UniProtKB/Swiss-Prot annotation:
Protein name, UniProt field: Antimicrobial peptide NK-lysin
PANTHER family in UniProt: GRANULYSIN, GRANULYSIN RELATED
UniProt function note: May be an effector molecule of cytotoxic activity. Has antimicrobial activity.
Propiece residues: 23-62, 141-145
GO cellular component terms, A-Z: extracellular region
Superkingdom to which the source organism belongs: Eukaryota
Localization (cell): Secreted
UniProt keyword terms in alphabetical order: Antibiotic, Antimicrobial, Disulfide bond, Secreted, Signal
Gene3D superfamilies, alphabetized: Saposin-like (1.10.225.10)
InterPro entries hit by this protein: Granulysin-like, SapB_2, Saposin-like, SaposinB_dom
Record lineage: Eukaryota, Metazoa, Chordata, Craniata, Vertebrata
Species this protein is from: Equus caballus
Length: 145
C-alpha cells in the first residue's frame, strides 16, 4: 500500500515537471483550468518584473530633479530681469509657478523652502545651474566651480 502511494505520488510529480518547486497548484499550471484557481499567484511574478523596468534609478531621479530645478530657475531669472533686487525677486517668485504645468508643485515647494538662498544666489549673479547645485537639486558638473 505504501509503495503504491509512493508510485502514485512519483508519477504525479513526473507528469508535471517543475510544478513541485514552482509553488503553483495543478489548476493554475493547466491554462485550460487556470481561471478556476486564484490567478493572482500566476500573474504576481509577471507584474513585479514588468514594473521593475519602469522604476527610476536614483541617478534618473536626480536627473529629473536637476532638470526641473533648472527650468524653474530659468523661468524665475527671466521674470526677474536684467537688474535683480530683493523686490523683483520676491515679485517674480510669487508669479513663477503659475504657468509651469507639471512642474507647478515642485516650483511651489522650491520657492517655499529655498527662496532666501535662491535670492542670495541671484543677487550674486549665479546662473540657474549654480543655484540648483547650491540648493542641492543638482550635482557639480565638470568645469563648474
Amino acid at each position: 500500500m505504501t509503495s503504491r502511494a509512493l508510485l502514485l505520488l512519483a508519477s504525479a510529480l513526473l507528469g508535471t515537471p517543475g510544478l513541485t518547486f514552482s509553488g503553483l497548484n495543478p489548476e493554475s499550471y493547466d491554462l485550460a483550468t487556470a481561471h478556476l484557481s486564484d490567478g493572482e499567484q500566476f500573474c504576481q511574478g509577471l507584474t513585479q518584473e514588468d514594473l521593475q523596468g519602469d522604476l527610476l534609478t536614483e541617478r534618473e531621479r536626480q536627473g529629473i530633479a536637476c532638470w526641473s530645478c533648472r527650468k524653474i530657475l530659468q523661468k524665475l531669472e527671466d521674470l526677474v530681469g536684467e537688474q535683480p533686487n530683493e523686490a523683483t525677486i520676491n515679485e517674480a517668485a510669487s508669479r513663477v509657478c503659475r504657468n509651469l504645468g507639471l512642474l507647478r508643485g515642485a516650483c511651489k515647494k522650491i520657492m517655499r523652502t529655498c527662496l532666501r538662498l535662491i535670492s542670495r544666489d541671484i543677487l550674486a549673479g549665479k546662473k540657474p545651474q549654480e543655484v540648483c547645485v547650491d540648493i542641492k537639486l543638482c550635482k557639480h558638473k565638470a568645469g563648474l566651480i
